[in-house]
């Protein structure tokens, strides 16, 4: 499988909608406390992504780099998306928060680490990004393993949530 980052077009938003509404894909998100975030369904972990939000979402996530970035993780051999990668700047953490979501039927193939490596390459090609950070609950061992295999290292753990970071210095080694 050859993976690449693919900038999503408006036609790709239907895939993102299916991804976020799939209970098997979103099971890792089930029961989390997001402070009453609109569109989040704690019983399934799914997140609403209605069609009327697509253009606005694209304006925020695709036209405001380095504040926001999103790309589909694309299997070039099969000519189809297998998930998405993102980052956004968190001023409080003074870091870009990295994320990856792999469609459930493509999990267990090492795509998390490979997709994160592509995200790392993209992020650190920019001079204005210095730290990628992720907060992964301890009850998600596959995600922890994927981030660590991609080169993220532990920064701390509080209330069972692991803070992992990847710095520009890590990238330049």
Give, region by region, the residue ranges found by the protein language model:
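A short beta-loop-alpha structural element at the N-terminal edge
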Residues: 3-21, 26-30
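Amphipathic alpha-helical recognition patches that constitute DNA-binding helices
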Residues: 15, 96-97, 101, 115, ...
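Conserved acetyl-CoA-binding loop-helix of GNAT-fold acetyltransferases
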Residues: 102, 108-122, 144-149
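Conserved catalytic-core motifs of GNAT/GCN5-like acyltransferases
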Residues: 133-136, 148-166
């Amino acid at each position: 499988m050859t993976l690449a980052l693919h900038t999503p077009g408006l036609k790709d938003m239907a895939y993102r909608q299916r991804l976020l509404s799939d209970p098997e894909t979103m099971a890792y998100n089930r029961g989390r406390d997001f402070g009453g975030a609109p569109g989040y369904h704690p019983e399934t972990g799914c997140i609403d992504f209605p069609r009327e939000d697509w253009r606005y979402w694209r304006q925020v996530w695709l036209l405001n780099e380095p504040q926001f970035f999103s790309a589909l993780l694309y299997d070039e051999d099969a000519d189809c998306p297998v998930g998405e990668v993102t980052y956004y700047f968190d001023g409080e953490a003074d870091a870009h928060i990295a994320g990856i979501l792999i469609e459930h039927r493509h999990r267990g193939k090492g795509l998390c680490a490979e997709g994160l490596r592509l995200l790392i390459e993209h992020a650190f090609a920019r001079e204005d990004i210095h730290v990628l950070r992720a907060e992964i609950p301890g009850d998600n061992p596959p995600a922890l393993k994927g981030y660590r295999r991609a080169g993220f290292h532990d920064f701390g753990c509080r209330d069972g949530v692991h803070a992992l970071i990847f710095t520009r210095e890590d990238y330049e080694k």
